[in-house]
């Protein structure tokens, strides 16, 4: 029972004819081709006939009734088959040489004929008959037939025309004898087609070699195609030139020249008497056209111009009503050829004239732009570009023209701009740039030329432009108004109204520009305005003395509110604010509050120098005799604020080291000593934390051990300091203090414990890590978070490794209560932060690559690995060491490259392993690269393993990629890859290729 789900074959259409039906009925081919839309088409028929023709020579031909019987002689009741083996000996005829003439040669012994059986001969005749129906239009054949089938058709044409078996390409000393089955006229036609196709193939040589091959390549091998494309073209050029100069009549095939074989008539031959005689002009036009195309392709422009002119001349000499059988030149393509050669008879468009003017140093550019103002064919952006180019060329002396040319081009562009909808270029730039020159006459001249050609809508746009110029161009507006009166564009009422508006729009000219004023003081009779101006100056100033002067002025105005309340953004630390508010209301209270608020504001904006300067002035102010009661307390608090700002500045400018770090460390110890001594006044928590972190970055660990661990902000710095102290005392692989480990773990809890300290949370951890600067502290924090990541992820394939990681525990109680996502995000951020300060730390680069690979960011991981390898080789100047790139890292790079679709990069990386894994190599090579940067042949110069190159050669041979195969073979033949070389040469060769490959990876991933 048939499967109901099995798809049924689609029945053929009623009008579809199968190829073998044309063998049975010789007249069917003509009837089929005469249809309006034959199915299959003529091109499809040629493909089918060529595909079904076996490319093998038979030793004998069968009788009409049975092609399977091998008979060594012709039956007695039939005549010989012309040109077929087994017939009567073919008499000798004149030879077909590479030249135009067909010289007669002495008689030779009997030659072999076509060596084809009847099926082969019948199919070849049918394919040539269909090609003749298409008038041997090589453009159509080239467009619709694969290159190999074009060569098969050419081979069959030469074989039938000469009456003997020929191969393509023809040898250089080709002098084949025309047998009885051939014909001199036909051979001449076939040889002409051969040389034409040889030249045409050079134009598409690269595409022909890369074109997909038909599945059945029995009729032409890839090597024969390569040989045909590599054939010298000079003999073909000489042959076609001689043919153009010859006066000998030239015949082409008629459709009836090819007679299909009949099954009942074994003596049927070709009717070479029925051939078209074409005019010499038609022949020369076609040949000169193809010669001109070849000359253009090979950049022989003088010869191309001569050939194109000869083609056009011969084509014009053909009477208009003549039917063309051989010439297939399309007028548009001929015009393109003539334009390419610079001899076109058609008038150039305005854009073409514009481009030609640019090539000829702006010749006639003004007249072209004037014409374009009416036609508007040239893009306005191109005109603007030319204006700027002319300006630059004149200013640098490249263009020996006066500024008048630049002025005329700019004026014409202004006029064109009037009619550009949505243009961003206006007339303001023109008047501003050329104000010192006489810029009005060129503009008026351009407007007068344009006015007669304007439509009503364009006149309205022109009026708006003129009104804008009259009202906004100051001194030149009066002169322009007198000119506009003569245009006849405005009525008298409009002109009067414009005149009145010009009088009203004329402003008094200020002595200095408002934008150049040093302040924004507006002198007014209203005191509120003056007070507001003073307040704005007070808010914006950054100098303590200026603050003092402005406060004195504001105090004189008897303000209704305290002066320290002018700006709500002035924020003062609470201890200092308490002291200041306890002062009596006075100038000193306002001055202290304002300086403290502005200093903190400046420090937030990064202006540390002015902030410290203001606090220093305030400290000096409070040391006066009248402030003796609170001098010591106020100065101590201000000193701590100065220290806080300087610590922040030092951390922000860590690599510049602008401050004395030793002195800064001593002051930090003194500040923390106040907390340890139990003074009544201690620094605020932010200052204590900054001092502790600063000592941690200066590796001053002992002073931190004596502080109270219960102080919330100091918990993390103290735990890190204790860890470093224990690491110095530790002997062997002993686990260190767990305080830092437990504290770090508590940061990543999904729900923080109630009893935990106030330091818990990712935000407080990042606030601490943001101020880490020393490399060792970075390494300790990275190792802890990396260890937490390894334990929570629990995947050996994505384990991270770095320094100090062996110090931490290997397990965590209740790991599900911790957030792996927070760990990954924090570690990713911390590695980026650490690498911004120490970008050449190889272990961190590799760890960041491992982390990116674990989260699926393959490109970023590859970038980190490549950066590590480039850094480890001192930018590819030193050999790659195993401690930089071991097998573990290389295999991860291979995985990244494969995930990115760069299978050739993964293949080359396999050579970096201690022992090449050919299983991975062959798998990657068989994959199709999906990345445009991973061209297979781009990395042949980076391969030093000959086994790998041999596999690549075999792979290209299977795929039919001939040029790539040759390139791989040439790489195998280099001297440094010789298997007999000593080990030193082999190591040097591998090192050079490794360095070359690393540079290629760095160019792709790091630039």
Curated annotation (Swiss-Prot):
The record's annotation in InterPro entries points to: Int8
Compositional bias of kind Polar residues: 56-78
State the compartments where it is located.
Answer: Nucleus; Chromosome
Is Nucleus one of the keywords UniProt gives this record? yes
Give the record's keywords alphabetically.
Chromosome, Nucleus
Motif WFEF motif: list the residue ranges.
19-24
Keyword Chaperone, does the record have it?
A: no
Residue ranges, annotated region (Disordered) = 56-112
Q: Per the UniProt entry, what are the Gene Ontology biological process annotations, in alphabetical order? A: negative regulation of BMP signaling pathway; positive regulation of gene expression; positive regulation of neuron differentiation; protein localization to chromatin; RNA polymerase II transcription initiation surveillance; snRNA 3'-end processing; snRNA processing
Task: One GO cellular component term, please give it.
Answer: nucleus
Instruction: State where composition is biased (Low complexity).
Output: 79-97
| Function field | Component of the integrator complex, a multiprotein complex that terminates RNA polymerase II (Pol II) transcription in the promoter-proximal region of genes. The integrator complex provides a quality checkpoint during transcription elongation by driving premature transcription termination of transcripts that are unfavorably configured for transcriptional elongation: the complex terminates transcription by (1) catalyzing dephosphorylation of the C-terminal domain (CTD) of Pol II subunit Polr2A/Rbp1 and Spt5, and (2) degrading the exiting nascent RNA transcript via endonuclease activity.
Please state what the annotation says regarding this protein's domains.
The WFEF motif is required for the recruitment of protein phosphatase 2A (PP2A) to transcription pause-release checkpoint.
Q: How does it assemble?
A: Belongs to the multiprotein complex Integrator, at least composed of IntS1, IntS2, IntS3, IntS4, omd/IntS5, IntS6, defl/IntS7, IntS8, IntS9, IntS10, IntS11, IntS12, asun/IntS13, IntS14 and IntS15. The core complex associates with protein phosphatase 2A subunits mts/PP2A and Pp2A-29B, to form the Integrator-PP2A (INTAC) complex.
The UniProt entry's sequence similarity note says: Belongs to the Integrator subunit 8 family.
What name does UniProt use for this protein?
Integrator complex subunit 8
Q: Which gene encodes it?
A: IntS8
């Amino acid at each position: 029972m048939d499967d109901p789900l099995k798809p049924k074959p689609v029945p053929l259409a009623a009008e579809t004819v199968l190829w073998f039906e044309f063998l049975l009925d010789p007249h069917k081919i003509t009837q089929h081709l005469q249809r309006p839309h034959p199915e299959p088409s003529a091109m499809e028929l040629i493909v089918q006939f060529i595909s079904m023709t076996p490319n093998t020579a038979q030793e004998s031909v069968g009788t009409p009734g049975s092609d399977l019987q091998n008979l060594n002689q012709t039956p007695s009741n039939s005549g010989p088959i012309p040109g077929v083996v087994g017939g009567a000996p073919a008499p000798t005829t004149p030879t077909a040489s590479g030249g135009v003439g067909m010289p007669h040669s002495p008689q030779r012994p009997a030659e072999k004929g076509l060596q084809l059986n009847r099926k082969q001969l019948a199919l070849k005749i049918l394919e040539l008959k269909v090609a003749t129906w298409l008038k041997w239009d090589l453009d159509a054949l080239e467009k619709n037939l694969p290159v190999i089938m074009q060569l098969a058709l050419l081979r069959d044409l030469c074989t039938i025309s000469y009456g003997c078996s020929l191969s393509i390409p023809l040898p250089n000393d080709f002098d084949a004898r025309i047998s009885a089955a051939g014909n001199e006229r036909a051979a001449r036609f076939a040889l002409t087609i051969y040389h034409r196709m040889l030249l045409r193939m050079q134009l598409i040589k690269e595409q022909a070699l890369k074109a997909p091959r038909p599945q059945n390549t029995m009729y032409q091998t890839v090597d024969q195609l390569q040989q045909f494309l590599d054939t010298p073209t000079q003999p073909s050029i000489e042959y076609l030139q001689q043919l153009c100069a010859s006066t000998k009549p030239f015949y082409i095939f008629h459709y009836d020249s090819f007679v299909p074989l009949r099954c009942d008539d074994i003596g049927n031959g070709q009717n070479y008497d029925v051939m078209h005689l074409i005019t010499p002009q038609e022949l020369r036009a076609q040949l000169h056209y193809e010669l001109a195309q070849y000359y253009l392709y090979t950049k022989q422009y003088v010869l191309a111009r001569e050939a194109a002119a000869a083609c056009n001349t011969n084509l014009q000499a053909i009477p208009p009503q003549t039917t063309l059988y051989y010439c297939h030149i399309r007028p548009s393509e001929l015009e393109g050829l003539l334009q390419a050669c610079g001899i076109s008879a058609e008038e150039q468009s305005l854009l073409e004239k514009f481009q030609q003017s640019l090539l000829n140093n702006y010749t006639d550019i003004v007249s072209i732009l004037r014409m374009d103002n009416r036609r508007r064919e040239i893009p306005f952006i191109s005109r603007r570009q030319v204006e700027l180019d002319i300006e630059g060329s004149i200013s640098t002396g490249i263009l020996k023209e006066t500024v008048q040319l630049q002025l005329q081009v700019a004026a014409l562009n202004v006029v064109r701009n009037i009619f550009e909808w949505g243009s961003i270029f206006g007339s303001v730039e023109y008047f501003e740039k050329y104000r010192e020159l006489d810029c009005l006459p060129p503009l008026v001249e351009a407007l007068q030329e344009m006015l007669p050609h304007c439509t009503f809508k364009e006149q309205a746009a022109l009026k708006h432009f003129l009104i804008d110029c009259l009202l906004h161009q100051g001194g030149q507006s009066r002169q322009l108004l007198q000119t506009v009166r003569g245009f006849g564009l405005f009525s008298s009422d409009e002109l009067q109204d414009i005149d009145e508006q010009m009088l009203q729009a004329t402003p008094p000219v200020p002595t200095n520009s408002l934008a150049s004023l040093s302040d924004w003081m507006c002198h007014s009779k209203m005191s509120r305005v003056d007070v507001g101006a003073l307040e704005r100056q007070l808010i914006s100033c950054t100098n303590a003395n200026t603050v003092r002067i402005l406060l004195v002025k504001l105090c004189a105005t008897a303000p209704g509110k305290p002066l320290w309340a002018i700006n709500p953004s002035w924020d003062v630390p609470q201890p200092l604010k308490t002291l200041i508010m306890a002062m009596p209301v006075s100038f000193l209270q306002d001055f202290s509050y304002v300086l403290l608020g502005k200093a903190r504001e400046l420090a937030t904006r990064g202006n540390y120098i002015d902030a410290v300067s203001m606090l220093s002035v305030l400290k000096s102010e409070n040391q006066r005799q009248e402030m003796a009661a609170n001098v010591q307390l106020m100065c101590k608090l201000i000193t701590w604020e100065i220290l806080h700002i300087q610590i922040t500045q030092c951390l922000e400018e860590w690599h510049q080291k602008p401050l004395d770090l030793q002195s800064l460390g001593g002051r930090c110890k003194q500040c923390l000593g106040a907390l340890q001594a139990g003074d009544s006044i201690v620094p605020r928590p932010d200052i204590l934390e900054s001092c502790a972190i600063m000592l941690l970055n200066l590796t001053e660990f002992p002073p931190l051990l004596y502080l109270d661990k219960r102080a919330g902000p100091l918990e993390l710095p103290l735990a890190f300091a204790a860890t470093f102290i224990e690491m110095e005392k530790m002997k062997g692989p002993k686990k260190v203090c767990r305080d830092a480990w437990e504290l770090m773990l508590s940061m990543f809890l999904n729900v923080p414990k109630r009893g935990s300290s106030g330091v818990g949370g990712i935000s407080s951890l990042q606030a601490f890590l943001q101020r880490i600067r020393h490399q060792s502290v970075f390494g300790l924090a990275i190792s802890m978070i990396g260890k937490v990541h390894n334990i929570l992820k629990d995947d050996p394939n994505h384990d991270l490794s770095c320094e100090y990681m062996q110090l931490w525990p290997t397990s965590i109680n209740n790991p599900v209560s911790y957030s792996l996502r927070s760990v990954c995000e924090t570690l990713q951020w911390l590695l980026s932060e650490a690498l911004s300060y120490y970008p050449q730390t190889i272990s961190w680069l590799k760890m960041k690559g491992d982390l990116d690979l674990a989260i699926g960011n393959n490109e970023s991981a590859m970038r980190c690995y490549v950066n590590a390898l480039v850094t480890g080789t001192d930018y590819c100047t030193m050999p790659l060491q195993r401690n930089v790139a071991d097998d573990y890292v290389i295999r991860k790079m291979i995985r990244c490259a494969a995930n990115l679709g760069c299978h050739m990069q993964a293949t080359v990386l396999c050579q970096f392993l201690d022992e090449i894994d050919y299983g991975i190599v062959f798998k990657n090579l068989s994959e199709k690269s999906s990345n445009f940067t991973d061209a297979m042949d781009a990395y042949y110069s980076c391969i030093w393993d000959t086994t790998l190159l041999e596999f690549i050669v075999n792979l290209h041979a299977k795929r039919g990629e001939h040029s790539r195969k040759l390139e791989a073979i040439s790489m195998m033949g280099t001297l440094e890859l010789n298997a007999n070389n000593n080990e030193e040469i082999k190591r040097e060769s591998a090192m050079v290729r490794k360095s070359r490959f690393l540079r290629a990876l760095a160019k792709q991933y790091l630039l």
